[in-house]
């Protein structure tokens, strides 16, 4: 088997429209629609799907949990711009900036939470 990438993640949220709007506004991610009205956002070549806990779409995770995700975005902007942007959108930084190691090497990261308390790392590679 040759796995080469991640296609999407699915976040279980309280309110799909609120989440779509927040990710679009805060991270400037394009909104997408698929499969008869499901909504998500595009992140590079990947996407984030949103579902509610009692979603009718199958299959789903065995224990879909609101606020149970922890994932990282990669940013290309200078760290000062990232911090300023988050402040402009009243997004609280819960940790960082911190030195971290991402899949491609050393990075500096800050951590925020979305409206459902999912933990989002925003990393800027040092190279």
PLM features per residue range, with description:
Residues 60-69:
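Helix-adjacent hinge/juxtasegments
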């Amino acid at each position: 088997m040759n796995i080469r990438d991640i296609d999407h993640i699915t976040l279980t949220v309280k309110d799909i429209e609120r989440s779509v709007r927040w990710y679009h506004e805060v991270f400037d991610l394009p909104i997408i629609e698929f499969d008869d009205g499901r909504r998500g956002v595009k992140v590079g070549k990947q996407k984030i799907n949103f579902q509610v806990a009692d979603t009718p779409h199958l299959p789903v995770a065995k224990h879909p949990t609101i606020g149970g995700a922890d994932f990282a975005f990669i940013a290309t902007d200078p760290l000062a711009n990232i911090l300023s942007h988050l402040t402009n959108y009243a997004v609280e930084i819960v940790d960082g900036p911190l030195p971290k190691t991402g899949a491609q090497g050393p990075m500096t990261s800050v951590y925020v939470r979305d409206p459902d308390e999912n933990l989002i790392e925003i990393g800027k590679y040092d190279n």
